Regions:
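Phosphate-centric recognition/catalysis
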Residues: 44-124
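Short acidic/glycine-rich loop or secondary-structure boundary segments that cap or lie
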Residues: 28, 74-76, 128-131
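Short, glycine/acidic-enriched capping/hinge loops at junctions between secondary-structure elements
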Residues: 29-34, 77-79
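A residue-level signal for beta-strand positions that form part of recognition/binding surfaces
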Residues: 14-17, 33, 64, 98
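Surface-exposed, charge/polar-rich loops and edge strands
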Residues: 16, 96-98, 105-106, 114-120, ...
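Conserved nucleotide-ligand handling architecture
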Residues: 1-19, 23-24, 29, 86
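Generic structural signal for well-ordered, non-membrane alpha-helical segments
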Residues: 13, 43-51, 130, 134
Length: 152
């Protein structure tokens, strides 16, 4: 995808991870183009268009799970995507599920089992880091910690 940074890690080829940049969307200032967040005051129509633009760059078979980040340490398993969940990390064992977090001044941390059986993503702000969001994410995954890789 144009305007994205692809993860450079040793994950299996079926695991895709990337972080988008701000260009390529329709949101106006102060959201500046590719805003995916409904909660910041941007037009819901623009956010929906931006999310649709993102999903159009990937396979239509994919199901998207977005988070409403709360700057904590909560981790949610995605069995079937639903409305935005309130937590700071997601993990799934389901194929074709895209786990999404939104970041500005926080860091997205991607996780994958070396065998590709499960993936996770965490929204790592300072409050979540202090509360243990990364540790909780690894604990929630069923793979042994030694079999989980991460990309920052």
């Amino acid at each position: 995808m144009k305007n994205a940074i692809a993860a450079d890690w040793a994950a299996p080829t079926k695991v895709v991870a990337f972080s988008t940049l701000r260009d390529g969307g329709v949101s106006k200032a102060p959201y500046e183009s590719l805003n995916f967040a409904y909660h910041v005051g941007d037009s819901a129509t623009n956010v929906h268009k931006n999310r649709t633009t993102l999903s159009a760059h990937l396979s239509p078979k994919l199901q998207w799970q977005w988070l409403q980040q709360i700057h904590g340490a909560g981790v949610v398993e995605v069995v079937e995507p639903t409305v935005e969940l309130a937590a700071d990390a997601l993990f799934t064992k389901q194929p074709n599920v895209v786990c999404c977090v939104q970041t500005a001044d926080c860091l997205p941390v991607f996780f994958a089992a070396r065998n590709g059986s499960e993936v996770a993503i965490a929204h790592a702000g300072w409050k979540g880091l202090v509360a243990g969001v990364l540790e909780n994410t690894v604990r929630k995954m069923s793979s042994d910690a030694s079999e989980i890789i991460a990309w920052l």
